[in-house]
């Protein structure tokens, strides 16, 4: 596997292998140095905390040195250097590139120029494939399976790249049902829905379906996406996970969030058995270590 640009780059067996490898890596006190004498470039044209640091830690754990930036300030990009030239430059300095960019398709564009492997760490509102592997690994850890579960994705389903990757990755499995819970202004994109091979239903009021859901994936309602602020005011409180919502969920259901959150999950929910988003974040390093293994073929 040379590049990871989309979740479609993973087969069902790839997911299974990554889960198994992440399990092994989580339990190791020392790690195989499969990236010894290698350099990983972290080219984060958008600022990042969790993704940047977890990729950095994963690479170092496997013996690599890392170079890179998070945000364009202080780089030649801020002076106007184009993406193609930056990627060509990084090919001279590194053995692998992890890229995050604000434009859809930037990771694929980079992979077409690059002679070294490229991993997509989020491109615009397109995809975030390695986050989805973390999401699915969290589900696997809690349910031992992904097939047969009922999913609810709630909040901004139009602009959140994690949603696109999540929905696409589910085509590799057999979910019982998927509920897409959002205001009409932020409903999932038609082109994404046309790719799905499993039953789904679009819902405005979570109360209609919350009791059925095994996995609730929450994203932030983005005020800046609404052309009319009054429309945002109408829906902003409708998609907050609070204790009232949790009380209606199955006892063994789980709540996921890619983080960072703003106010879409109340702090009081953090201590409930359903809250798994910090556990989810803790899997970022072992899962991304497993992804590096997949890239180098070891």
From Swiss-Prot:
Pathways per UniProt: Pyrimidine metabolism; UMP biosynthesis via de novo pathway; (S)-dihydroorotate from bicarbonate: step 2/3
Residues involved in L-aspartate binding: 79, 161, 220
InterPro entries on file: Asp/Orn_carbamoyltranf_P-bd (IPR006132), Asp/Orn_carbamoylTrfase (IPR006130), Asp/Orn_carbamoylTrfase_sf (IPR036901), Asp_carbamoyltransf (IPR002082), Asp_carbamoyltransf_Asp/Orn-bd (IPR006131)
Annotated EC: 2.1.3.2
Pfam families in the cross-refs: OTCace, OTCace_N
Top-level enzyme category: transferase
UniProt KW Transferase keyword: yes
Keywords linked to the UniProt accession: Pyrimidine biosynthesis, Transferase
A molecular-function term among this protein's GO annotations: amino acid binding
Function recorded in the entry: Catalyzes the condensation of carbamoyl phosphate and aspartate to form carbamoyl aspartate and inorganic phosphate, the committed step in the de novo pyrimidine nucleotide biosynthesis pathway.
Subunit note: Heterooligomer of catalytic and regulatory chains.
Full protein name: Aspartate carbamoyltransferase catalytic subunit
The species this protein was found in: Sulfurisphaera tokodaii (strain DSM 16993 / JCM 10545 / NBRC 100140 / 7) (Sulfolobus tokodaii)
């Amino acid at each position: 596997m040379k590049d990871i640009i989309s979740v479609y780059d993973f087969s069902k067996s790839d997911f299974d292998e990554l889960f198994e490898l992440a399990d092994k890596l989580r339990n190791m006190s020392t790690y195989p140095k499969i990236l010894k004498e290698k350099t990983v470039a972290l080219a984060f044209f958008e600022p990042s905390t969790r993704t940047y640091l977890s990729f950095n830690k994963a690479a170092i754990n496997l013996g690599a040195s890392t170079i890179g930036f998070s945000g364009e300030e202080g780089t030649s990009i801020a002076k106007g250097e184009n993406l193609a030239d930056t990627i060509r430059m990084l090919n001279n300095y590194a053995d692998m590139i992890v890229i995050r960019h604000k434009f859809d398709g930037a990771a694929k564009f980079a992979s077409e120029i690059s002679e070294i492997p490229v991993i997509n760490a989020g491109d615009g509102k397109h995809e975030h494939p390695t986050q989805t592997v973390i999401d699915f690994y969290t589900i696997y850890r809690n349910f031992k399976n992904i097939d047969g579960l009922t999913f609810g994705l709630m909040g901004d389903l139009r602009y959140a790249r994690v949603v696109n990757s999540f929905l696409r990755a589910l085509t590799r499995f057999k979910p019982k049902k998927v509920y897409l819970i959002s205001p009409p202004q932020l409903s999932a994109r038609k082109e994404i829905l046309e790719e799905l091979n499993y039953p789904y239903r679009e819902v405005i009021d979570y109360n209609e379906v919350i009791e059925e859901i095994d996995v609730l994936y929450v994203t932030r309602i983005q005020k800046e996406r609404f052309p009319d602020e009054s429309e945002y005011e109408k829906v902003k409180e409708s998609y907050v996970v609070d204790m009232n919502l949790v009380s209606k969920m199955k006892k063994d259901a789980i709540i996921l969030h890619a983080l960072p959150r703003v106010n879409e999950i109340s702090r009081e929910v953090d201590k409930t058995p359903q809250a798994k988003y910090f556990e989810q974040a803790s899997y970022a390093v072992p899962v991304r270590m497993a992804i590096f293994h997949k890239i180098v073929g070891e």
